[in-house]
Amino acid sequence: MNKEELLKKYEATSNEKAKDVFFSPGRINVIGEHTDYNGGHVFPAPISLGVYGVYGPRDDKKVRLYSGNVDGDIVEFDIDDTNVEKDEDRFWANYFKGMITYLREKYDGIDHGFNLYIEANLPSGSGLSSSAAIEMLMGIILKDEFNLDVDRVSLAKMGQRTENEFIGLNSGIMDQFACIMGKKNSAIFLDCNTLKYEYLPLALGDYEIIIMATNNPHTLADSAYNNRVAECGRALKKLQQKLDIKALGELDNDTFDEYSYLINDETEIKRARHAVSENQRTLRATQAMKDGDLEKLGRLINASHESLHYDYEVTGKELDTLAEASWKQPGVLGARMIGGGFGGSAIAIVKKSEAENFKKNVGKIYRDAVGYDASFYDAEIVDGTKRI
């Protein structure tokens, strides 16, 4: 997206010059799905699809948000206003309001409002973490404008708090961490229990990652996402009768199998089994990445999707169609759904020489199966949220 064009759009909506332009990336997750809130490991990376913000300070306390993706969509509120926006047309402002609220709780000096023109090139409802991108965009803008002594990990935690407490979605920290801590051409191997992390180059050689958007938007807060969190929580509590653990991510597969009888509920056993096995797959996958064993990485990615389908039950027809069609194509190492599920997106690791045929073939299979088109994007891995 052209910076000069963004500046012109800001001036057209605010009748003044902008101060700065910022970009906050969306993210993919190579493997480690629904493990972050279970104290497990994840392996995400920020992508070139994301959210742009053109910023200008005001001399009053008004915050004026203008969305370039919905023509004329403007939300205004006072910087002291900490009320959750209930109106569906204004709900997107909550991601900004939550960050403003929690930063002002901890840091003095955020004493004036601002104008912000926002435009995203993320596919709508794609599950590529536009909400976390917005939260981290707001965090970095406020840190920059008011010279706040806040580190990026703390901003990621505030973004998670915005989701959990302000929005009401019981998500983990992976999305915010990936958006703000990203490093070009690398994925982040993150322990969500300790927040220890390691950058691993996404060295795929003759292969690339292709993002496949179902174009069936997911709405996590209105879906079964919170139910999955609760089911895992109940399973953990039952396991704690015999095991000294704080999270499902502390278990290996054998220990879980030995003590799963304590759960005594088939659905909760399935949910917990995914959380445990997916964490183990993530550990093995990152080791395969270090070893340069891309075929093993691909097999683990496929197994991740199967677990998300059978044990976690968050895939659905669209995501299953994309994954299963991908598995049948030449030059594909692995494919799986990413994000919360219930729509959204999938990824595939595809040989570069087969990429165009892959998109054509999978696209046709998908359209024939569901009745509308999927969208395909090459995943370019970029730095985390920053001024541009």
UniProtKB/Swiss-Prot annotation:
Annotated PANTHER family: GALACTOKINASE-RELATED, MEVALONATE KINASE/GALACTOKINASE
Keyword Transferase: yes
Family: Belongs to the GHMP kinase family. GalK subfamily.
Organism of derivation: Lactobacillus helveticus (Lactobacillus suntoryeus)
Keywords: ATP-binding, Carbohydrate metabolism, Cytoplasm, Galactose metabolism, Kinase, Magnesium, Metal-binding, Nucleotide-binding, Transferase
Known role: Catalyzes the transfer of the gamma-phosphate of ATP to D-galactose to form alpha-D-galactose-1-phosphate (Gal-1-P).
MF (Gene Ontology): ATP binding; galactokinase activity; magnesium ion binding
The protein, known as: Galactokinase
Gene Ontology cellular component annotations, sorted alphabetically: cytosol
Catalytic activity: alpha-D-galactose + ATP = alpha-D-galactose 1-phosphate + ADP + H(+)
Site positions for Transition state stabilizer: R27
Keyword Signal belongs to the record: no
E.C. designation(s): 2.7.1.6
SUPFAM superfamilies xrefs: GHMP Kinase, C-terminal domain, Ribosomal protein S5 domain 2-like
Annotated compartments: Cytoplasm
Binding annotation for ATP: S67, G125, S126, G127, L128, S129, S130, S131
